[in-house]
A protein has these predicted regions:
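A glycine-rich beta-strand to alpha-helix segment
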Residues: 104-124
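Residue-level preference for the first positions of well-ordered beta-strands
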Residues: 9, 106-108, 155
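A polyampholytic, Gly/Pro-enriched intrinsically disordered region
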Residues: 98-109, 166-175
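Active-site-proximal alpha-helix that buttresses catalytic centers in soluble enzyme cores
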Residues: 2-84, 88, 92-95, 116, ...
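Short, acidic Gly/Pro/Ser/Thr-rich loop/turn segments
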Residues: 17-19, 117, 165-166, 180
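Short secondary-structure boundary/capping segments
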Residues: 1-2, 71, 99, 147-148, ...
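Domain-level recognition of soluble alpha/beta enzyme cores
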Residues: 124-170, 176-179
Length: 180
């Protein structure tokens, strides 16, 4: 029987980007994004959610989000910049998560909407219980809030035994909106 590693998936939508006259992949962070990313890095550290591994889109705004968030972690986990994250669908991201070695306790995935939001909803809405909660512990209200807005620099925290399982122990325990 496989050991339960208490794995946690952190889905981090990149911080607010600017819209200069450059290709979409090359868009930098806006001032608000530059300010929000370090706050989110510190929040992860303070919440005890320092990742053991990071998967990050190759888009500049995602790389910049990691660059500004990482110092707040007070750790330097290995990071992989993966071009497959940019433009991916939720199912593509799920496949990338499945490639991560089982020994990784906490995985941080920095990417883009709609895929980040769609993956969070997919995992958080795993089969509902009689109590009206998904197996992930997310209520219909939690899911509705996430559907209505998964803002830039927001993080969904999904905790479970082995990434990604069809049923989760709990989720959206750390739904964190971007820094004010």
């Amino acid at each position: 029987m496989a050991e339960d590693h208490g794995r946690t998936l952190l889905l981090f939508r990149h911080a607010k980007s600017a819209w200069p006259d450059v290709a979409d992949h090359d868009r930098p962070l806006a001032r608000r994004g530059i300010e929000a990313a370090p706050v989110m890095g510190r929040w992860l550290r303070d919440a005890g959610l320092v990742p053991g591994q990071v998967l990050c889109s190759t888009a500049r705004r995602a790389r910049d989000t990691w660059q500004f968030a990482q110092p707040g972690l007070a750790a330097t986990p290995p990071v992989t910049f993966d071009a497959r994250i940019y433009g991916a669908a939720a199912t593509d991201l799920l496949a990338l998560v499945r490639e991560v070695p089982p020994a990784t306790g906490t995985l941080l995935l920095i990417g883009h909407n709609p895929a980040i939001e769609d993956l969070a909803l997919l995992l958080a809405a795993a089969p509902a219980s009689a109590a009206g909660r998904g197996a992930a512990g997310a209520t219909p209200g939690d899911l509705d809030r996430m559907r209505s807005k998964f803002p830039t620099a927001a993080i969904a925290v999904l905790d479970h035994g082995s990434l990604p399982m069809p049923t989760l122990a709990r989720s959206i325990t750390g739904w964190v909106d971007r820094a004010a």
